[in-house]
């Protein structure tokens, strides 16, 4: 077993060796390196064919028509293109958008930008388990609501929203529905031929593909329109200009092809490992599960260890690559906004660790993790005056702390 153990698959994944091998065939002079927009020679035609195959592989995994797949530089761009693109196109109908407080920053900050441009945004608070109450969503819908953006799987706590039900509600009212599926695609079944979802964002690097490539699904029937945010040569049906990075697209396509083949068995394996990890640590005193195992993605476990500071715990667990919060915001020392939205106090939010498992995680690694976590929590609590006071029965909330 190699140390450190990588348990941060929700931040990024290694590229699958099969994907890396494929990418290499589309880079050099003796490979297929042409520009797919070059219509006058074989180099361009071969590149275009490779892009078409990848587009089909991505559409295949999610039950879409390949013509509905628009390539972008990643899920952040897909979220921006979907939300700004739809808001700008449909603003004559209304200027009200609904999202949730636990969305990824790529959705929240895009909505904040639209607020500065005169749109009105309602941010729904989830229930304690992280799930959005559909009655609250319905109550928030107005005549001038043009867009709802609610993610499929949360990147920090792994809860799965009922996107099928939300889609039905939106379609019945003629509201565009965008789903950020970055954390769910290839891990949970998605069938866009059945779901009433209009726009869906995908990433390459969360599913063993390369970084820097993503896609946006844009429904054709009933037709959904978006305004381009990137202008140039009119690539991708005019929705996203820019020369297509064939090697990255081929890598993403291959990753999605593999995911389709292996998803069912991999889901069960990961769920087993996640449950093994939780069962191994849940009897530690003052341990809280954030989210909901029953309505949760099979690969994410978010746990708070009371009376232990999250940053010091991460230092103590130096043999494990884990995170407190998401990688995109873990550079700041603010407690996770997702956990705060669930109603956790600052202390519990600060003492949270996200374990995210993946294709190369083994049972041996999980057992080592359990042992290490148990040891580290014990050691850190031995050093903690707060833990000592708690064990003596002192109500820590009633203490007036001196402010210097």
Swiss-Prot record:
Residues the record lists as binding [2Fe-2S] cluster: 328
Residues that the record marks as modified (N6-(pyridoxal phosphate)lysine) are 206
One Pfam family from the record: Aminotran_5
The subcellular localization recorded is: Cytoplasm
Q: Which UniProt keywords apply?
A: 2Fe-2S, Cytoplasm, Iron, Iron-sulfur, Metal-binding, Pyridoxal phosphate, Transferase
One CC-aspect GO term: L-cysteine desulfurase complex
UniProt EC number: 2.8.1.7
So where does pyridoxal 5'-phosphate get bound? 75-76, 155, 183, 203-205, 243
Identify a single GO molecular function assigned to this protein: metal ion binding
- Name the reaction it catalyses: (sulfur carrier)-H + L-cysteine = (sulfur carrier)-SH + L-alanine
The record's listing under PROSITE patterns reads: AA_TRANSFER_CLASS_5
| Subunit structure and binding partners | Homodimer. Forms a heterotetramer with IscU, interacts with other sulfur acceptors.
What's the stated role of this polypeptide? Master enzyme that delivers sulfur to a number of partners involved in Fe-S cluster assembly, tRNA modification or cofactor biosynthesis. Catalyzes the removal of elemental sulfur and selenium atoms from cysteine and selenocysteine to produce alanine. Functions as a sulfur delivery protein for Fe-S cluster synthesis onto IscU, an Fe-S scaffold assembly protein, as well as other S acceptor proteins. Also functions as a selenium delivery protein in the pathway for the biosynthesis of selenophosphate.
Instruction: Supply the name of the protein.
Output: Cysteine desulfurase IscS
Q: Which organism is it from?
A: Escherichia fergusonii (strain ATCC 35469 / DSM 13698 / CCUG 18766 / IAM 14443 / JCM 21226 / LMG 7866 / NBRC 102419 / NCTC 12128 / CDC 0568-73)
């Amino acid at each position: 077993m190699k140390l450190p153990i990588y348990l941060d698959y929700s931040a990024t994944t290694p590229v699958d060796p099969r994907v890396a091998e494929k990418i290499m065939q589309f880079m050099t002079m003796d490979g297929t390196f042409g520009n797919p927009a070059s219509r006058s020679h074989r180099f361009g035609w071969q590149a275009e064919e490779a892009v078409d195959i990848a587009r089909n592989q991505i559409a295949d995994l999610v039950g879409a028509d390949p013509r509905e797949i628009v390539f972008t530089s990643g899920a952040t761009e897909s979220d921006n293109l979907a939300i700004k693109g739809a808001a700008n196109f449909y603003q004559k109908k209304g200027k009200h958008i609904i999202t949730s407080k636990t969305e990824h920053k790529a959705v929240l900050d895009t909505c904040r930008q639209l607020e500065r441009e005169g749109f009105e945004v309602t941010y729904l608070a989830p229930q304690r388990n992280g799930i959005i109450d559909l009655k609250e969503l319905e109550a928030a819908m107005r005549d001038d609501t043009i867009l709802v953006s609610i993610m499929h799987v949360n990147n920090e706590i792994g809860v799965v929203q009922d996107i099928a039900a939300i889609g039905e509600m939106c379609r019945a009212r003629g509201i565009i529905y965008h789903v950020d599926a970055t954390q769910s695609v290839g891990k949970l079944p998605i069938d866009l031929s059945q779901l009433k979802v209009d726009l869906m964002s995908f990433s390459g690097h969360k599913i063993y593909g390369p970084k820097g490539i993503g896609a946006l699904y844009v429904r054709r029937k009933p037709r959904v329109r978006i305004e381009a945010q990137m202008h140039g040569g009119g690539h991708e049906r005019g929705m996203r200009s820019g020369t297509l990075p064939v090697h990255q697209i081929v890598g993403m396509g291959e990753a999605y092809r593999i995911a389709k083949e292996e998803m069912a068995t991999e889901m069960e394996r990961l769920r087993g490992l996640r449950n093994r990890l939780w069962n191994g640590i849940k009897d530690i005193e003052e341990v809280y599960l954030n989210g909901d195992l029953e309505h949760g993605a099979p690969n994410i476990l978010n746990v708070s260890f009371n009376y232990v500071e999250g940053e010091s715990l991460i230092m103590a667990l130096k043999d494990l690559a884990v995170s407190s919060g998401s990688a995109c915001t873990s550079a700041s020392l603010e407690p996770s906004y997702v956990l705060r939205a669930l109603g956790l106090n600052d202390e519990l939010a600060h003492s949270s660790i996200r374990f995210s498992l993946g294709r190369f995680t083994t049972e041996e690694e999980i057992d080592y993790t359990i042992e290490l976590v148990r040891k580290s929590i014990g050691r850190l609590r031995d050093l903690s005056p707060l833990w000592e006071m708690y064990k003596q029965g002192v109500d820590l909330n009633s203490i007036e702390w001196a402010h210097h």
